[in-house]
Each structure stands twice: as structure tokens, then as C-alpha cells.
């Protein structure tokens, strides 16, 4: 279905994210409640006009500052986060030299293994990319 969604669709990113989660669920990466949790967040995004609010942006910046200043930072992720933001989180973790932990409520050895494999796949992909010119961590 991903290829059928035109990039001009106003909810393109949302629909692509949803499809990625559906596939991840079929692949055994997510808990049964993962789509419910994502849908709840999507509802709020829709109600907020699909824009990052000023307070949310302020919170994002505060988290970045705290991670950067922390003596022993750790990025803790669940299945949805691994699927939707895993690559970006690996880049952040590399920038601030911190580990990423898989922290899932409905934990099974198989799910943990699959999520670790996914994150390792992302890590291998990212390790082959060049650092952008004039890149600077802020």
C-alpha cells in the first residue's frame, strides 16, 4: 500500500508510519496494543492540526539539552519507537555517545531479539553513510 499513497496526500507521513507499524506488527516486532497506542497519538496530532506546538518544541529542546549534559544518558525505546524513529535515535545516540535500550512492557525473548536485530540493521545502514558537510551537534 505504501507505493499507492501519493506524496501529495495531506496525511502522507501519517499513512506511511501506519503502514510501517502494520508491517512491523505482522513481523512480530510489536505488542498487540501498539496500533492502539499509535492511533491515540495520531488522534491528538490531528486535533492539534498536525503541527508541533510551541510547548512540544520547547520540551524537545529541553530533552536534547538534558541528554547532552547527562553523565550517563540512556535512550530507552519501545517497539513503535524502534520502527518509526530507530535510525534517528541511533544517530542521536552516536552524537552523544550513549546506549539505546529496548524497554518493552509486553516483553518476550523473541520480540526483544527482533527489535535488537532491527536496530542493528539500522546501525549498519547508518554506519555506511557519510557525515553531512558542516555538520555540528548542538
Task: Tell me what each language-model feature is.
Residues 1-99, 109-111:
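Electropositive, gly/pro-rich neighborhoods at or near active sites that engage anionic ligands
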Residues 93-138:
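Long, charge-dense
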